[in-house]
Amino acid sequence: KSPVTVAQFRTFVETTAYKTEAEKFGDSGVFNLEKQNWELMPGAFWQKPFGGAGNDAENNHPVTHVSWNDAVAYTNWAGKRLPTEAEWEFAARSGKNSENKFSWGNEISLDGKYFANTWQGELKTPEVKDGYLYTSPVGTFGENEAGLTDMGGNVWQWCADTYKAYPGSTAPIREDPNVKTIRSGSFFYDQYGEDSYSVSGRSMNSHETSLFNTGFRCAMDSK
């Protein structure tokens, strides 16, 4: 229904003694708003999104600083799996052949009410009209018609797939099995703007990468 939360990931770690790749590397990706650049923040990992001196991650927020490999380890433990990119988009469209731009409709906001945790303003001048500069509790902005939350904004979400060009696309994409697809967009600025939060928005990252705006959700085969 929702992205995996900090509390859920903690249960996994406490049960298995799992160490994330961010913990093994000793750092993870955080954007420094003051310096306006990405940094490998020492001590940043799923419990400390902004490094050792920062606040603890909140239990009901989506877990972040997890790589694709970490996400797969969790899903294997939980008896689930990562969704394929096609499954993710099908779910974002509530299982319909919907023409809506976003999982909830066609507008990011209406009469001052935001439908997702998304970036507003320029990179140098962030605005917090939706109430959250960084992650928000899962489900804060409600469900789509399929009963799923956070299918646009809050955190990018790992998919099972290697990132590939769509059939018929002329985009010069070199397939690399270590580069995986991410969906949903996040709370953070994206060069593609609103399109990153759309049901068709997509991006990619290497399977070892962990960032302060990337998490995951689980899928299961129907019985």
PLM regions: where:
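Short, solvent-exposed alpha-helical surface patches in non-cytosolic proteins
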Residues: 1-13, 67-73, 89
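Short, structured active-site-proximal loop/turn typified by the sulfatase FGly-forming signature C/S-X-P-X-R
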Residues: 13-19
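Functional-site microenvironments in short loops/helix caps that host divalent-cation chemistry
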Residues: 19, 24-200, 207, 212
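Short, structured beta-strand segments at or near domain termini in extracellular proteins/domains
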Residues: 212-223
